[in-house]
Amino acid sequence: MSLAQQIEPPQADPGWSAHLQLRFIQREGVTRLGARRHVGPLLVQRPFYPEGAPCHVYVLHPPGGIVAGDRLELDIHLEAGSHALLTMPGASKFYRSIGPTAHLAQRFHLAAGSTLEWLPQDSIFFNGAQASLDSRFSVEPGARLLAWETLCLGRPVMGERFDQGAIDSRLCIDLPGEPGLHERLRIEGGRLDKVGGHPLVATFCATPADQAVLEQVRQQLEALDTPAGATLLGPLLVIRLLDHDNQHLQRNLQRLWHLLRPAVLGLAPCPPRIWAT
């Protein structure tokens, strides 16, 4: 089935729909964007190759943000042996809603021997937002993954709390022969007790990892002045960080990535250029 055949026409909805599908392939030792297809304002810039074989791609969310009833779908397929690093130049903004829920669904399939680095900007939920996030990763044998997700509840830099609204966030990572990670976080009406009262929560996952990698990460986390922890679920390393300052949190995530990229992928760090702006 072609990418074009897989995308169904948008259905009638109070909001608008956007769908982006990307397929990465390896040719002569270099990862290429073998196919792309989009419906609506969910796009990618041209690929970058700052380190040779891996393909760096920037995913562009709608600049106007996400409002009531909007539906965004992102489907990423990595074929065997390919390596893609995906990030975003800006945050995903979910605005206040007095009506339908806004939906963001993200699907990632990692074929055998492929590598994905999913390093997006944060998802910001304005006070009163009604939003559903569903991120799922399917990891085949020999594939490698570095992925983080950051939720910003309200706009702490402006003193805005998340006092109203509801967030339903699901994160699933399926591993071959392992239970992986299946979790759900629901936040309603300003009740941030599940995250210790912190408006920012980040999850960083890496596989394959082992006890030695876990110990390296824990040593780095011990130096932080904000709550953080790490654990191993089989070969999956799961790191959690809480914060009140988004820039501080992003710096800590990037430091962890600088540690984990050589430890898990065997590659020297090559930060996306957007991080320097």
Curated annotation (Swiss-Prot):
The keyword Chaperone applies. Transmembrane segments: none annotated. Disulfide bonds: none annotated. GO terms for cellular component: cytoplasm. Signal peptide: none annotated. Keywords: Chaperone, Cytoplasm, Nickel insertion. It is found in: Cytoplasm. One of its GO terms (molecular function) is nickel cation binding. The keyword Heme does not apply. UreD, UreF and UreG form a complex that acts as a GTP-hydrolysis-dependent molecular chaperone, activating the urease apoprotein by helping to assemble the nickel containing metallocenter of UreC. The UreE protein probably delivers the nickel. Required for maturation of urease via the functional incorporation of the urease nickel metallocenter. Belongs to the UreD family. This is Urease accessory protein UreD. It comes from Pseudomonas entomophila (strain L48). The gene is ureD.
